Regions:
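Conserved beta-loop-beta element that borders a ligand/cofactor-binding pocket
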Residues: 146-171
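Conserved Rossmann-fold NAD(P)-dependent oxidoreductase catalytic core, especially the SDR/UDP-sugar
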Residues: 95-137, 153, 161
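N-terminal Rossmann NAD(P)H-binding glycine-rich loop of SDR-like oxidoreductase domains
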Residues: 3-26
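NAD(P)H-binding glycine-rich loop region in Rossmannoid oxidoreductase-like domains
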Residues: 39-42, 48-92, 96, 100, ...
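Glycine-rich Rossmann NAD(P)(H)-binding loop
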Residues: 170, 192-198, 225-232, 241-247, ...
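Active-site helix of classical SDR
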Residues: 141
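Mid/C-terminal beta-alpha module of Rossmann-like enzyme folds, strongest
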Residues: 213-272, 300, 304-307, 314-324
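Substrate-positioning beta->alpha
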Residues: 96, 173-179, 193-216, 222-223
């Protein structure tokens, strides 16, 4: 089976392409699609992804597509209309690719969406049956892409699988998770000890394994799955487990949650506060029931792999980018 992987040079894309090199996946050949040359074996440079991208060369002979490429951020103050920027890549770019897949005979399209389509925070675990409630431009663009893909699937027979992962961590992670990892590794006291929430995350190895299952399982076609590790944890528990993986003490200070929330608001870090203070968990029953899939790695195993990568990164620094 020949598989096109978009966003192949990104955090998840690199892990997925590495997985295809393992012996058990020898039946697959991959076409890593990248925006600019990255030196990946067999890569296809497609340039900017939007509603006009020419995918014909990349899709030649391809049986399935894993669509990871997305716009995740826009520079504050530099984009007058963030929603238009997100839609250009995440909605129009996705649907244009799907239509070209239909035209070239691609059978299956695995779309990596986001748990943010469901919402930002909720005490109860999210399920696939919940009505989507995207709260920002990124999440809305992903939700609109999902709706468009379902319409294309209904009209053409393209086998669409939609995956909504929770926060992804693992070797190569960046952004807020890396900042928290660095703080724990450096022994910074963290005022998070009084937080009582539940957060679902997913180790990149588990996400890759789920993608591979969805590529080949007949029952995956037409389904949407929420993805996470097997357990949700509170923010203080995550810090403790992270510290254990790093071989460091967890230096937690218990400050009142309302005080933390107020401080985050003053610092214009409300989005970060939601991720640290509030709950967001998912019920993974559907993918277990329909595909027989369970995460092969535990949270602690994922954190140990991440900690080992971080230690090696400190020993021989290498710039990590979020570009796909």
């Amino acid at each position: 089976m020949k598989v096109l992987v978009t966003g192949a040079s990104g955090f998840v894309g690199r892990a997925l392409c590495d997985a295809f090199l393992r012996a058990e996946y020898a039946k697959y050949s991959i076409v890593p699609a990248v925006r600019s040359p990255r030196g990946l074996p067999g890569e296809c440079v497609v340039g900017e992804i939007d509603g006009k991208t020419d995918w014909r060369e990349a899709l030649h002979g391809v049986h399935a597509v894993v669509h990871l490429a997305a716009r995740v951020h826009v520079m504050n103050g530099r984009v007058a209309d963030p929603l238009t920027s997100f839609r250009s890549v995440n909605t129009e770019g996705t649907l244009h690719l799907a239509r070209q897949c239909v035209a070239t005979g691609v059978r299956r399209f695995v779309f990596i969406s986001s748990i943010k389509v469901n919402g930002e925070e909720r005490a109860a675990a999210y399920t696939e049956a919940d009505t989507p409630a995207p709260e920002d431009a990124y999440a809305l663009s992903k939700w609109e892409a999902e709706q468009g893909l379902r319409q294309i699937a209904g009209e053409t027979g393209l086998e669409v699988v939609i995956l909504r992962p929770t926060l992804v961590y693992g070797p190569g992670v960046g952004a807020n998770f890396l900042a928290l990892l660095r703080a724990v590794a450096c022994g910074v006291p963290l005022p998070l000890g009084a937080i009582s929430n539940q957060r679902s995350l997913i180790y990149v190895g588990n996400l890759v394994d789920a993608i591979l299952r969805c590529l080949e399982h007949p029952a995956a076609a037409g389904k949407t799955f929420l993805l996470s590790d097997s357990e949700a944890v509170s923010t203080p528990e995550l810090v403790r487990r992270m510290a254990a993986a790093l071989g460091r003490p967890a230096r937690l200070v218990a400050l009142p949650v309302p005080l933390l929330r107020a401080a985050a608001t003053l610092a214009k870090k409300s989005a970060l506060a939601i991720r640290l203070l509030d709950s967001l968990s998912v019920d993974g029953t559907s993918i277990r029931r329909d595909l027989g899939w369970t995460p092969p790695f535990t949270l602690d195993e994922g954190l140990r792999e991440t900690a080992a990568w971080y230690a090696n990164r400190k020993a021989s620094p290498r710039k990590t980018t979020g570009k796909t």
